[in-house]
A protein has these predicted regions:
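N-terminal targeting signals for export/organelle localization
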Residues: 1-42, 173
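Short gly/ser/thr-rich secondary-structure transition/capping motifs
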Residues: 21-23, 42-49, 116-119
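A short beta-strand-turn-helix
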Residues: 39-62
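Short pre-active-site segment immediately N-terminal to redox-active cysteine/selenocysteine motifs
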Residues: 59-61, 66-69, 132
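Hydrophobic beta-strand core positions in alpha/beta domains
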Residues: 62-64, 92, 138
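C-type cytochrome heme c attachment motif
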Residues: 68-75, 135
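Structural microenvironment flanking redox-active thiols in thiol-disulfide oxidoreductases
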Residues: 74-110, 119-126
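Thiol/disulfide oxidoreductase modules built on the thioredoxin-like
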Residues: 107-112, 119-170
Length: 173
């Protein structure tokens, strides 16, 4: 009866390889490698808006979905400010939020966004395949999604995931 232990052992090895092969935090996205969906946003009063043409302006950029009620959005905000301070264009999409709360959030923490719009009903988020906030996309200069990252942008994520995607996006321009 050596066959059952060998079969079990082989299965255990394959399962172990499968578990450690991919990033367990990475969520699949059918959008990567595809053109960004249409930008259909409501104006954020007092802020510059962006549109489809902005995503195809020849410049690599980040698009960040956020909300004032989102604790991880608050946690990632200093990292978005730092990326913006480095000259990386960051475009914000305020997701299903009260305007006053969103405005207070930016007044308190700072505004890292080159331009911003509001997705009040979450309809645009459906087209983008949003899982939840925060969520950040790396977009190349032709408007192609290079990376979709679900979750807060930490310093580790910037170095291991965002910067390599920005470099890849710059190479595809």
């Amino acid at each position: 009866m050596i066959a059952p232990p060998l079969i079990f052992g082989a299965f255990a090895v394959l399962a172990g390889i499968g578990m450690f092969r991919d990033d367990p935090d990475a969520l699949p996205s059918a959008r990567e490698g595809q053109p960004a969906p249409p930008v259909v946003l409501t104006e954020f009063p007092g802020k510059k808006m962006f549109d489809d043409e902005t995503l195809r302006d020849g410049q690599v950029k980040l698009v960040n979905y956020w909300a004032s009620w989102c604790a991880p959005c608050r946690a990632e905000h200093p990292n978005l400010e730092a990326l913006s301070g480095e000259g990386i264009p960051v475009y914000g999409i305020n997701y299903k939020d009260q305007l006053g709360n969103a405005d207070a959030f930016l007044a308190e923490l700072g505004d890292p966004y080159k331009a911003i719009g509001r997705d009040e009903q979450g309809r645009m988020a459906l087209d983008w395949g949003l899982y939840g906030v925060p969520e950040t996309y790396v977009i190349d200069g032709q408007g192609t999604i290079i990376l979709r990252f679900a979750g807060p942008i930490t310093q580790r994520v910037i170095e291991s995931t965002i910067r390599p995607a920005l470099e890849k996006a710059a190479g595809s321009n």
